Amino acid sequence: MAKHDLSDATLPDFKALEAECMSIVLQNGKVPETRAAILPLLKKASIDGREAALRHLTTNGSGLECAGMISNLQDNLITLVHRMVTQAVYPTTQQEFAVAAVGGYGRSTLAPGSDIDLLFLLSVKAGADARKAVEFLLYILWDLGFKVGHATRLVEECIRLSRTDMTIRTAILETRFICGEALLVGELQKRFDAEVVEKTAPEFIAAKLAERDERHRKAGDTRYLVEPNVKEGKGGLRDLHTLFWIAKYYYRISDPADLVKLGVLSRQEWRMFQKSDDFLWAVRCHMHFATGKPEERLSFDLQPEIARNLGYNARPGLSEVERFMKHYFHVAKNVGDLTRIVCASLEDKQAKAAPGLTAAIGRFAHRPRRIPGTPEFIEDRGRIALSGPDIFKRDPINIMRFFHVADLHGLEFHPDALKAITRCLPLIDHDFRENEEANRLFLSILTSKRDPALMLTRMNEAGVLGKFIPDFGRIVSMMQFNMYHHYTVDEHLIRSVGILAEVDQGQHADIHPLAVKLMPNIEERTVLFVAVLLHDIAKGRQEDHSIAGAKVARRLCPRLGLNDKQTELVVWLIDQHLLMSMVAQTRDLHDRKTITDFAEKVQSLDRLRMLLVLTVCDIRAVGPGVWNGWKGQLLRTLYYETELLLSGGFSESPRKERAKQAAEQLAEALSDWSQKDQKTYTKLHYQPYLLTVPLEDQVRHAHFIRQADKADQALATMVRTHSFHAITEITVLAPDHPRLLSIIAGACAAAGANIADAQIFTTSDGRALDTILINREFPIDEDEMRRANTISKMIEDVLAGKKRLPEVIATRTKGRKRNKTFTVKPHVTISNSLSNKFTVIEIECLDRIGLLAEVTAVLADLSLDIHSARITTFGEKVIDTFYVIDLVGQKITNENRQGSISVRLKAVMSEQPDELREQMPSGIIAPAATKSPAAEKKARV
């Protein structure tokens, strides 16, 4: 790549610096004293030069120029030290070695925190002093704080090693002379070209592409990860470097601009190359300057600062960081386009390679063949290719036919064909979009029984999807600045379609069995595929994306060929696509009002089935680890309860009668107990417990409570884990207390456990039976049970007063550092319409360790009795819902009291000073010496 010239004004005065350093060297005869004397001068020059580069980056914005300035600065420093060494310290070595830059430094670009890769080339006549001179130079660089990757070799050694070591071969490919004996570097480059590069291009290209694929696999094989690696990630700088290495090796060029002269890239594509390279270098340089280290991962905490430094401003619906990251992913996509274009050109050159018997046999064996019924396309080694150069210009609809034929025949894509499509994107105009055949073919691709996600991905990468559906084009490369969504919006939508296709094919029944079971019964399969593709299409707008997306669907669906009924169903699904997820995760599914309200919105079993499948696809496509068995269980519970109501099977028998029947069933399940024990332990529970807790859990609880009573334990815990549900259950038996849930939550926080749900019940003898569900951490049950026992021990120790809650919480981090990057405005909603019996309090704020403990402590301090709680985390944001009543069992209807509750909760969520938090109770509720109620009764007798 071209070297970046700098005016003398931008760098320190190296002539004056050299004169001063040379004077010091001549005055000091000893090497150590010489190094120590000149080091401060060189260090100041290095600092001043890098500060100048940062100023230039800030004012000019060019990343390549900044990287070029730092490279030039480094050249000057190395040249200066080399002159001192060879002229004053080891004067006999002037013609015995050369210093060359390799790697990225060899391209005359250097990031602020990057290593300096040097090759010291020795003459065959070099003596011991030459190696001492190299050592002197290296010590200076190390003393200056640089990380130096280096090798000292003869030209012959370089040639020999590069034949077998692809890393060394790549480094030598980019060798650039800095100072010393230039003839040595010239000899290396000449011999390398003749003895190594000649006739080995296919081998080198294959190795570099395999290396790239492995790098992508390690970094995350998508260019749309929302915390990308700017250097190593897909669509990053290393991909551009690989492209240049391949082009330089194959075409024997020294400047990427020569690819235009060779006809590999158009002028427009070359400008894309330059802009992409410059942008990625700007981002990388800013990252290094901001962190003071070679940071390559564009993490959430860095993104806002880099966005500001690059001058991005917020626009309606998109913050400045979201606009910056959209640009970043757009550039990453362009890098992918350029890679395809160059690979297509290389393959074309290979196909026209040297004649001969072997080549002829190879071409015959892989001779392209016609695809029946499609004269426009041919199959070339399992890939769809074009039968002529003007296929798309003659009939633009061939662009859509291309993807449809590839899907029908299960073909991959020839890079030359994709390059042609990219260059013909202007043909996808209004007439194309309104063409009936184009829309029919697209719908066939979307609803394919094969791999629609792959086709959509290729269409998206080629730019076709965004041109064909302009509203989709608006969300291409769009990221959402939060810790919940792992991918850009377009990637999320395509992954959602891929998961729907898997469900449609009956795959992963172990992960989401209900969705797989329901899919064959969904009549409007096409509607579901369209809804899944479009459900987030209106992200990034001022209007709620569900509402705006429904409007987009109402316009688009008729164009795709859907009738009025199908269109309205797609519109409803998009408008309500978050409903089932939010109800399942934030509402008490054992509260009948939850089910009746949800059923009233859904209205039909067909809608219910489709909404369930859409919800599963949406959550699973958010990112790794977001879907788990617990969420699946919540969705299944909501589905089955609603299905029962919509199908007319919801029981209307009196609550009291149903509770009586439940108690009788429990007694029957305990038939091997004495009648006295049966009566005692069935009468412990009130109606809410009997009507909501499954019978098998009631039986477990009965055994648990009786065992605690026999052991005279006032405080006891029981644990079990569910690998399928991905949760671990901790049941706590303790004397009832207003702050019990708060203290349990605090103990869980201290143990590092994330509470997913809480069921709270009071027994007739004044005890609390609380069941806490925490997210699993380990896949193996034995490991998870050890963790669960540790957490339950922490709960017991805190409740028994063996450990003080404020102290154990203080041992944990004060909060997740990454969360501090985000802003979630604290919000409190208090509703009396979501439950017939309870007031529902919902809070939304930034998540942090110990938050639930503090919130529940506030509710207890406000004399509110928590019946149940739902704790839901969306990345950095938490939505906690509490079903509460006052101390006399009534809803909270007084507006003034609701206002005071809201104020107190917002103060805690905002981490404002609060007396309650300062005076948090030690946690003593059930001292170890306290006897159980049964034991006390026995003692009185």
UniProtKB/Swiss-Prot annotation:
Residue ranges of the region described as Uridylyl-removing: 373-728
Domain called HD: residue spans: 489-611
Disordered as annotated region, ranges: 916-941
Keywords for this protein: Hydrolase, Magnesium, Multifunctional enzyme, Nucleotidyltransferase, Repeat, Transferase
Entry's EC annotation: 2.7.7.59, 3.1.4.-
GO biological process: regulation of nitrogen utilization
Pfam families: ACT_ACR9_3rd (PF24931), GlnD_UR_UTase (PF08335), HD (PF01966), NTP_transf_2 (PF01909)
Domain ACT: 729-810, 840-919
Activity regulation (UniProt): Uridylyltransferase (UTase) activity is inhibited by glutamine, while glutamine activates uridylyl-removing (UR) activity.
This protein's domain notes: Has four distinct domains: an N-terminal nucleotidyltransferase (NT) domain responsible for UTase activity, a central HD domain that encodes UR activity, and two C-terminal ACT domains that seem to have a role in glutamine sensing.
Function description: Modifies, by uridylylation and deuridylylation, the PII regulatory proteins (GlnB and homologs), in response to the nitrogen status of the cell that GlnD senses through the glutamine level. Under low glutamine levels, catalyzes the conversion of the PII proteins and UTP to PII-UMP and PPi, while under higher glutamine levels, GlnD hydrolyzes PII-UMP to PII and UMP (deuridylylation). Thus, controls uridylylation state and activity of the PII proteins, and plays an important role in the regulation of nitrogen assimilation and metabolism.
Protein name per its UniProtKB record: Bifunctional uridylyltransferase/uridylyl-removing enzyme
Natural source organism: Allorhizobium ampelinum (strain ATCC BAA-846 / DSM 112012 / S4) (Agrobacterium vitis (strain S4))
